Curated annotation (Swiss-Prot):
It is found in: Secreted. It comes from the Eukaryota. The modification Phosphoserine is found at S131. This is Somatotropin. Pfam families: Hormone_1.
Length: 216
């Protein structure tokens, strides 16, 4: 492995292992730039995990000829499509940081229940088998977003006052066609929602700390 790649991997691993700061006064405050960097790395990691799991599930269970029609039917399936959250980078840039943090938190919290059933669905998955702590990873990102909200608190509407909703749990009966389609749809939403959360966090980080990685 090249020295540059090795250094980059070690830096990413170190940042992913860093704990979030606790309530004010418990520990010295972490710089805001570090809070954003940690949150973005965690969101990227979860989004990649969701995308890999979705692709593996698709290869294993969904015939290639049926994928396009099923994906079209899933277009309005995700509950996140029913909330006024930005759908892309351009729309996200029009929202305040607190709005984006609230939407990110809502998206993450909507998956905390369903993902606890993932390990039962993907017991033999090569992708999921190496990442069976997805619930803990989501909780970690939730804490990071809450830490950012505490730092940026502006006294406006709190995230807890937003309408909260969760997805159905994953179906463990993998012999049922209905269960396969349900899980396929849930994984699609999981991937989309984590992509949104990652996008929101990257937009916030880039406009606060101008850097070359803002082009995404």
């Amino acid at each position: 492995m090249a020295t540059g790649s090795q250094t980059s991997w070690l830096l990413t691993f170190t940042l992913l292992c860093l704990p979030w700061p606790q309530e004010a006064g418990a520990f010295p405050a972490m710089p805001l730039s570090n809070l954003f960097a940690n949150a973005v790395l965690r969101a990227q990691h979860l989004h990649q995990l969701a995308a890999d799991t979705y692709k593996e599930f698709e290869r294993a269970y969904i015939p290639e000829g049926q994928r396009y029609s099923i994906q079209n039917a899933q277009a309005a399936f995700c509950f996140s499509e029913t909330i006024p959250a930005p759908t892309g980078k351009e729309e996200a840039q029009q929202r305040s940081d607190m709005e984006l943090l609230r939407f990110s938190l809502l998206l993450i919290q909507s998956w905390l229940g369903p993902v606890q059933f993932l390990s039962r669905v993907f017991t033999n998955s090569l992708v999921f088998g190496t990442s069976d702590r997805v619930f803990e990873k989501l909780k970690d990102l939730e804490e990071g977003i809450q830490a950012l909200m505490r730092e940026l608190e502006d006294g406006s509407l709190r995230a807890g006052q937003l309408l909260k909703q969760t997805y159905d749990k994953f179906d463990t009966n993998m012999r049922s066609d209905d269960a396969l389609l349900k899980n396929y749809g849930l994984l699609s939403c999981f991937k989309k929602d984590l992509h949104k959360a990652e996008t929101y966090l990257r937009v916030m980080k880039c406009r606060r700390f101008v850097e070359s990685s803002c082009a995404f």
